[in-house]
Curated annotation (Swiss-Prot):
Signal peptide: 1-17
Name of this chain's protein: Class II hydrophobin C
PROSITE patterns referenced in this protein's UniProt entry, alphabetically: PROKAR_LIPOPROTEIN
Cystine pairings recorded for this chain: C232-C281, C242-C272, C243-C255, C282-C293
């Protein structure tokens, strides 16, 4: 009997030591939170429910968010580095998998929208070749590529083909074929093949066939010196080359500069023929390969 009395007393004392309410607000024994679910109260009156963290008196959060201060909102894990920012691929010299916009954009915003529709970004490039454009850069703001001007520090307005004049700091307006006259600082207007005059600083106008005469500073209309400019007119296709092969009309392989100057198209052809090549006018001769070439005028 005495043994049973002692055992009953031990049993009763053990039962009283185990809390029966995990949410009594003052207990020190807290259940292990389920994975992804945490109930923590750090001040009197806290009564967390579900997966919450409470850090102030009288708080009673509901749902599954964490409160860290007034008017805070949970985030979805996305990060932003500033208004209007977007990720980039870090490629500043060439665009990969490029294509011409489906239709001519009327503004910078329209350009962006056209490219965004196919999951791409707008770029201004030099030479599109087989899906890869060489030497690309971001478009300038939201201005129209064929209307509104953009300028560099101290310069005049800037535009792409068919748009407004472009200049370098302190210079006169500059344009590509079909645009307005172009010049270097202090010089006369310069243009690509459209008959507009071209000059160097202080010189007289220079033009392609059918335009005005050509000169250098301090001289008046001297005879042409060097290669015949009528074969490869100034502009995009202005580099005379002797090339061995042509690929799809876009790239000429194994090209080299003519070994001597020529004054006629026939001389240009004969110089190239002596090394088994054909005369071409190219845009960008690079390491023996000229990209985008065409046949010389009158050859």
């Amino acid at each position: 009997m005495k043994f049973l009395t002692v055992a009953a007393a031990i049993f009763a004392s053990t039962s009283l030591a185990v809390p029966t309410n995990n949410h009594n607000g003052g207990g020190a024994c807290v259940p292990r939170p389920n994975p992804g679910n945490s109930n923590t109260s750090s001040a009197p009156g806290g009564n967390p429910t579900g997966g919450h963290t409470s850090s102030g008196p009288g708080t009673k959060p509901t749902g599954s968010h964490t409160s860290s201060g007034p008017a805070t909102k949970p985030t979805d894990g996305n990060t932003s580095s500033g208004p209007g920012t977007k990720p980039t691929d870090g490629n500043t010299s060439s665009g990969i998998d490029c294509e011409v916009p489906r239709h001519a954009p009327t503004s910078g915003d329209d350009f962006k929208g056209i490219c965004a529709a196919v999951g791409k970004q707008p770029l201004c490039c030099v030479i599109p070749v087989a899906g890869q454009d060489l030497l690309c850069q971001d478009i300038t703001g939201g201005n129209s590529p064929s209307g509104q001007p953009t300028s560099v520090p101290g310069g005049q307005s800037t535009s792409v083909p068919g748009g407004n004049p472009t200049s370098i700091p302190g210079g006169q307006p500059t344009s590509v074929p079909g645009g307005q006259p172009t010049s270097v600082p202090g010089g006369h207007p310069t243009s690509a093949p459209t008959g507009h005059p071209t000059s160097v600083p202080g010189g007289q106008p220079t033009s392609v066939p059918g335009g005005n005469p050509t000169s250098v500073p301090g001289h008046h209309n001297p005879s042409p010196v060097g290669n015949d400019p009528s074969c490869c007119p100034s502009g995009l296709y202005s580099n005379p080359q002797c090339c061995a092969a042509n690929v799809l009309g876009l790239a000429d392989l194994d090209c080299s500069t003519p070994s001597q100057t020529f004054t006629t198209g026939d001389e240009f052809r004969n110089i190239c023929a002596t090394i088994g090549r054909q005369p071409m006018c190219c845009v960008l001769p690079v390491a023996g390969q000229a990209v985008l070439c065409e046949k010389p005028v009158g050859v």
